[in-house]
Amino acid sequence: MHRLVRGLMLDEDCIPDQGILFRHLPSLAARAGLQSFKCQAAPNNKQMIPFEYLEHTADVKFRAYGKTPEQMLSNAAAALFKTMVDPATVQILETWMVVLEAPELEDLAYQWLSEIVFLFETESAVFASFRVQLRQNGSWKLAAEIGGERIDLKRHSFENEVKAITMHQFQIKKNEKNDLWCIQVILDV
């Protein structure tokens, strides 16, 4: 197992208790005065879809959903990686641990997705499983296990090269009516 820690020691403090209450924080977009989006996942036989791709002129735009912030961030990571490589071609042969901390949930989500792109580039690895745990105690802490393998050009064909996660229209919402969490992301490809 690979342990990658950026500015935080991996300890018991990073593993959340089951009864943690999450609150919705003002989005980066709201703080910047940008127009908000609605957090409504399209039903798929009355089941929540994990993510959907939206039209964008030059880049890749998606929304990922979850019943919890952890599920939303796992689904966002899956949507990010699906834009790069077919996850069906990726075997879980290795795991990487990522630990991050940020004052706001959106800041943490941005770091999380950026870290996945960083790992892809520096570890020459592709990923297909993302297990995220969160804890909020003043700041937000993320401990995640990512499963995947080293790039094998015979099996992995790449769809898009993701250069970066953009801050443009990046935001997280919680739909209070159905308790659904939603993140909107634009990838610079």
Where are these regions (language model features)?
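Ala/Thr-enriched low-complexity intrinsically disordered regions
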Residues: 29-32, 41-42
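Intrinsically disordered, low-complexity regions
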Residues: 46-189
